[in-house]
Amino acid sequence: VLSAADKSNVKAAWGKVGGNAPAYGAEALERMFLSFPTTKTYFPHFDLSHGSAQVKAHGEKVANALTKAVGHLDDLPGTLSDLSDLHAHKLRVDPVNFKLLSHTLLVTLASHLPSDFTPAVHASLDKFLANVSTVLTSKYR
């Protein structure tokens, strides 16, 4: 459960991301594909090279979903229900991959916002991404 301080930290950090969210989403995906090559198996139809239009487009989808989630921190299950259905029933993404993407998102944010990425903000973003991952995997059961 996110505390009031966590919610404030997440909103403030995501506010600093601003219009860079799609680019950061794409960068986090690239980092994930490079660091955890098995994740590429879910994207056999994608050009996974650096700067790929498909990776950029999917990064934007990820960023838009996170932006939506940040705006509805008190109702993540309702906000992300459609995405949970998609990933569980149609795409059948192994739940561990959400943790891997969360990790690369944190690394990406830390690299772009070093002065804002305090231990408290890191912890709050980590909790937020863990909550998002939990919601996205909730319909696997």
UniProtKB/Swiss-Prot annotation:
This is Hemoglobin subunit alpha. The modification Phosphothreonine is found at T108, T134, T137. The modification Phosphotyrosine is found at Y24. Residues 1-141 form the Globin domain. The keyword Glycosyltransferase does not apply. GO terms for biological process: hydrogen peroxide catabolic process. Red blood cells. Heme b binds at H87. GO terms for molecular function: haptoglobin binding; heme binding; iron ion binding; organic acid binding; oxygen binding; oxygen carrier activity; peroxidase activity. Heterotetramer of two alpha chains and two beta chains. PANTHER family: HEMOGLOBIN FAMILY MEMBER, HEMOGLOBIN SUBUNIT ALPHA. The keyword Heme applies. It comes from the Eukaryota. The modification N6-acetyllysine is found at K16. The modification Phosphoserine is found at S3, S35, S49, S102, S124, S138. Keywords: Acetylation, Heme, Iron, Metal-binding, Oxygen transport, Phosphoprotein, Transport. GO terms for cellular component: blood microparticle; haptoglobin-hemoglobin complex; hemoglobin complex. The modification N6-succinyllysine is found at K7, K11, K16, K40. O2 binds at H58. Involved in oxygen transport from the lung to the various peripheral tissues. Belongs to the globin family.
